[in-house]
């Protein structure tokens, strides 16, 4: 229970720090966008590997090739490494997706890669069930 309490305290401080540094839509997006999947990722994957949230940015804004804002679930920036982390639910990212949304998602990931980000995606089900999360194998995290 102590580790859960420690996680809860650290997670609350992590969100508060980012909320205090944001205004407008960037703040609103963090208030609306950091929900169950993102918190589960923080608890079951990131916290287990790192035990802190240093260099991790939730709901990180990137301007896309059209000049529109795109908010990544997380971006970890440390030295030369810029890592986009997305948690993808089956519904919005597969079942409810049409061809245009599918193309847009692939174009967005290609754009992020071209901009120097490494992009990794986790299935929500794997995060929620604590299985097959490959982050511990990533040597630069």
Regions found by a protein language model. Name each.
Residues 1-10, 18-19, 113-141:
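Basic, glycine-rich
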Residues 1-51:
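Solvent-exposed, charged helical/coil patches
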Residues 38, 67-70, 104-105:
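Amphipathic coiled-coil/heptad-repeat helices and related helical stalk/stem segments
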Residues 48-53, 110-117:
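Short helix-loop-beta junction
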Residues 54-84:
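Active-site metal-binding core of divalent-cation-utilizing nuclease and nuclease-like domains
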Residues 61, 88-90, 122-127:
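Short strand-loop junctions, especially beta-strand C-caps/beta-turns
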Residues 75-102:
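Short beta-strand-loop-alpha-helix junction that forms the active-site gateway
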Residues 99-111:
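Short, charged, amphipathic alpha-helix that recurs within catalytic cores of restriction-modification
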């Amino acid at each position: 229970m102590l580790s859960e309490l420690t996680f809860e305290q650290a997670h609350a401080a992590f969100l508060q720090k980012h909320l205090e540094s944001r205004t407008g839509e960037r703040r609103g997006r963090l208030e609306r966008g950091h929900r169950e999947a993102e918190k589960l990722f923080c608890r079951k994957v990131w916290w287990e590997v790192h035990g802190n949230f240093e260099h991790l940015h939730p709901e990180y804004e990137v301007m896309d090739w059209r000049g529109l804002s795109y908010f990544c679930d997380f971006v970890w920036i440390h030295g030369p490494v810029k890592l986009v982390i997305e948690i993808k639910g089956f519904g919005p990212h597969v079942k409810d997706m049409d061809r245009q949304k599918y193309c847009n998602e692939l174009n967005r990931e290609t754009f992020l890669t071209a901009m120097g980000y490494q992009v990794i995606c986790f299935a929500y089900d794997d995060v929620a069930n604590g299985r097959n999360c490959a982050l511990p194998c990533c040597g630069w995290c």
